[in-house]
């Protein structure tokens, strides 16, 4: 999980400081903000001469950046597709739950995967049909190319068929939109969700570090470091 990645960084920091110098450019998944921050902090204690930058441009851009070598490490919050593996390698560094979030005023506390599928494809359009108050459901999601969107749509089986009212370019923007609208529902990285919105359970299982680890929470995906196959080890 993201917390495990942080612990790994702290462990690495306990080793003797090295003598490397230079810059490492990372970019991609906005959901990996907390993970890359924790790893960067730990790495800085081991190799203080290396500067690590992070550009939150989305998973698709992270994979592209690693492919065309504009990034040293691309960050993807989804597994690599077969046609993307020709030029780059993917290394899983953490697992993350995709939390289903609603406004804090919502009466809905649990949804099934089937209900989510019907809601996001427009078959269910009113909250009263899933135990909430009478009101039109407002679907908030991520933009095409987002790893979070890809993970959610693949697991819920709604690939390219969602009826989004809003398609936003960052995890934080989705959370803010759901916070501001009592009728909204969206999805976001567990590592990014705070107390401004409510997380619903999925088929009775909460989205947490423990349920992601043991696999009981169904809507989860990997966090992946993407590196170019042709880059020499000294360059990476």
Spell out what each predicted region is.
Residues 2-236:
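Exported/periplasmic ABC-transporter solute-binding proteins
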């Amino acid at each position: 999980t993201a917390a495990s990645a942080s612990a790994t960084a702290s462990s690495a920091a306990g080793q003797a400081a090295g003598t490397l110098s230079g810059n490492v450019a990372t970019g991609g998944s906005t959901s990996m903000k907390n993970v890359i921050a924790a790893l960067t902090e730990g790495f800085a204690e081991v190799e203080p001469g290396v500067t690590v930058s992070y550009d939150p441009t989305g998973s698709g851009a992270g994979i592209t950046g690693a492919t065309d070598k504009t990034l040293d490490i691309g960050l993807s919050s989804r597994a690599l597709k077969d046609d993307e593996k020709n030029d780059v390698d993917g290394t899983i560094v953490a697992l993350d739950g995709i939390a289903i979030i609603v406004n804090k005023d919502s009466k809905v506390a649990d949804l099934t995967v089937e209900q989510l599928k019907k809601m996001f494809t427009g078959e269910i359009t009113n909250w009263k049909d899933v135990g909430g108050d009478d009101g039109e459901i407002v679907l908030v999601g991520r933009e095409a190319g987002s790893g979070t969107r890809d993970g959610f749509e693949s697991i819920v089986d709604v690939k390219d068929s969602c009826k989004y009212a809003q398609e936003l370019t960052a995890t934080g923007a989705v959370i803010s939109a759901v916070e501001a609208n009592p009728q909204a529902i969206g999805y976001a990285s567990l590592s990014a969700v705070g107390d401004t919105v409510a997380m619903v359970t999925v088929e009775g299982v909460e989205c947490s570090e423990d349920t992601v680890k043991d696999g009981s929470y169904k809507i989860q995906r990997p966090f992946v470091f993407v590196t170019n196959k042709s880059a020499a080890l000294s360059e990476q």
